[in-house]
């Protein structure tokens, strides 16, 4: 199967975009051959995002979990297809932490893989913005040793002078700066998480918010 075959599989099963890239450095210790990544995403519902007000809605929390479950299923199935073709594959969960050592990050940043695959850019909010759907997406990644190349070049940041997310963030966690090339965060993940846990315990035990997604003008909610 070719890269296009596998990307077409993802698109046929619910992803709205998919791509691939070579990573600058292999992310898995002891597995240097896993230096390529499939990146793909699913779109969140406009109507559900509009239900977010001064905090997350119950509908958004459930929708968020359902999107993650779909992504994890797609990543698992893609990994199976890759292994059937004789490649190694390491699915990275849609939402995953690495314990106390890295409580706000997974095995490899989905946003980095998506940007390197030419699928979009990381905005001032720290969110990934896809070319067609803005930040109203969720991402997953599968690391592999199958050689992959981007279908499009890396996209320039498209935020311009907009700071809608900065003004709307109730935690004050968004700096309003563009992300750096060395991967330094342009928002305070700890402050974001702390605010959610303190103020949104009744919705998913403070695990989601979504305000920065709702207010982003790139999303053009219908």
Give the ranges of each region predicted by the language model:
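Non-catalytic, usually N-terminal nucleic-acid engagement modules in DNA/RNA processing proteins
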Residues: 1-68, 73
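Catalytic cores of enzyme domains
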Residues: 26, 67, 71-222
């Amino acid at each position: 199967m070719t890269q296009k075959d596998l990307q077409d599989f993802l698109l046929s099963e619910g992803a709205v975009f998919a791509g691939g890239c070579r990573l600058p450095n292999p992310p898995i210790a002891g597995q240097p051959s896993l230096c390529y990544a499939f990146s793909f995403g699913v779109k969140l519902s406009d109507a559900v995002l509009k239900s977010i007000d001064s905090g997350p809605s119950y509908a958004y929390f459930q929708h968020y979990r359902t999107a993650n479950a779909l992504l994890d299923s797609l990543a698992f199935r893609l990994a199976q297809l890759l292994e059937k073709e004789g490649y190694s594959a390491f699915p990275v969960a849609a939402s995953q932490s690495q314990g106390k050592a890295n409580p706000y990050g997974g095995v490899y940043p989905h946003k980095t893989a998506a940007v390197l695959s030419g699928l979009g850019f990381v905005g001032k909010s720290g969110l990934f913005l896809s070319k067609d759907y803005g930040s109203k997406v969720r991402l997953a990644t599968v690391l592999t040793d199958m050689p992959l190349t981007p279908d499009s070049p890396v996209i320039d940041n498209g935020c311009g002078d907009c700071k809608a997310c900065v003004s709307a963030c109730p935690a004050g966690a968004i700096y309003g700066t563009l992300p750096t090339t060395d991967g330094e965060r342009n928002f305070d993940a700890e402050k974001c998480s702390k605010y959610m846990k303190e103020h949104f315990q009744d919705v998913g035990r403070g695990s989601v918010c979504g305000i920065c997604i709702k207010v982003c003008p790139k999303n053009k909610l219908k």
